Amino acid sequence: MSVLGACITPFKADLSIDFAALESVVRSQEHAGNGIILFGSTGEGLSLTYEEKLSILSFVSTLNLNVPIFVGVTATSVQETMSWIDFAQQWPIDGFLVPTPLYTRPGLNGQKAWFDRILSVSRKPIILYNNPIRTGVSLYPEVVKSFVSHPLCIGVKDSGGSAQACELFAESGLRVFCGDDNLWPDMRLSGASGVISVLANVWPELARDYVAQGRPIEAWKKVCSWLNLSTNPLGIKALMAAQKMIECDAVRPPLSIRDLQRRDELADILACRATLQTELLSVCRQ
């Protein structure tokens, strides 16, 4: 599978979880044949309580989805992380997306110990996650290489923003997922073989087709550049609300939708869909 949608968690105006919209979000990924990531930064995992995560897992498990479901794990305590994984893997999920711990900025040996402890408790596959902007530290390529032989370590998501870093991860032999929609063409050339996509939330089929053809497309770049002006998931929720895919573009504190940049360009960004479809068709015919 080349695309996993980094799914939003839709909220109602009162900031409670909108389960009807959530079903629509994950069903759209299933229809496109994309995998699903829950509770990542796009899904505002840090703003969800333990009980809310359980309610989402319970709800999604009743949908009998026919695509892989991975659960994002974000914490600073290794014991808390291990306990959460031990509990969450009782549900019918397919694995976990695990970054370096937040805030503490561990070095090479600390990162090895962190992932070693987590892998020791997991019975599901794990994708390691490099996201230095969010966590405060880069995932060391040496750490990735040290877990290559572990049967449950199946890949790396790289949101480091550099094709060079992607190449180092790819040298390990593990599968690398690009964590930035806009960088996919460059990271594909550097060894990435899939994308964990934010844009798949709003245009799941187009994301699938864009990743499959693997070449730069100007309309895609334009949308990604607009999204990157604001903290994720402000932009993607605004796009989805404008297309009536979700009830509203609400995000939970400390995020605020009032921080969305260039809202006046929203209609122009939505119009990129038709251009993107045309460009993808043109590329496929070449």
UniProtKB/Swiss-Prot annotation:
Primary location: cytoplasm
Location relative to the cell: Cytoplasm
Enzyme class, spelled out: lyase
SMART domains xref list: DHDPS
Record key words, sorted: Amino-acid biosynthesis, Cytoplasm, Diaminopimelate biosynthesis, Lyase, Lysine biosynthesis, Schiff base
Pathway note: Amino-acid biosynthesis; L-lysine biosynthesis via DAP pathway; (S)-tetrahydrodipicolinate from L-aspartate: step 3/4
Domain of life: Bacteria
One GO CC term on file: cytosol
Family matches, as CDD domains: DHDPS-like
Annotated positions for site Part of a proton relay during catalysis: S41, Y103
Catalytic-site annotation from UniProt: Y129, K157
Record field: catalytic activity: L-aspartate 4-semialdehyde + pyruvate = (2S,4S)-4-hydroxy-2,3,4,5-tetrahydrodipicolinate + H2O + H(+)
One record GO biological process: lysine biosynthetic process via diaminopimelate
GO MF terms held by the record: 4-hydroxy-tetrahydrodipicolinate synthase activity
PROSITE patterns registered for this protein in UniProt: DHDPS_1, DHDPS_2
EC number in record: 4.3.3.7
HAMAP family recorded: DapA
Subunit annotation: Homotetramer; dimer of dimers.
Family: Belongs to the DapA family.
Function, in words: Catalyzes the condensation of (S)-aspartate-beta-semialdehyde [(S)-ASA] and pyruvate to 4-hydroxy-tetrahydrodipicolinate (HTPA).
Designated name of the protein: 4-hydroxy-tetrahydrodipicolinate synthase
Organism of origin: Chlamydia trachomatis serovar D (strain ATCC VR-885 / DSM 19411 / UW-3/Cx)
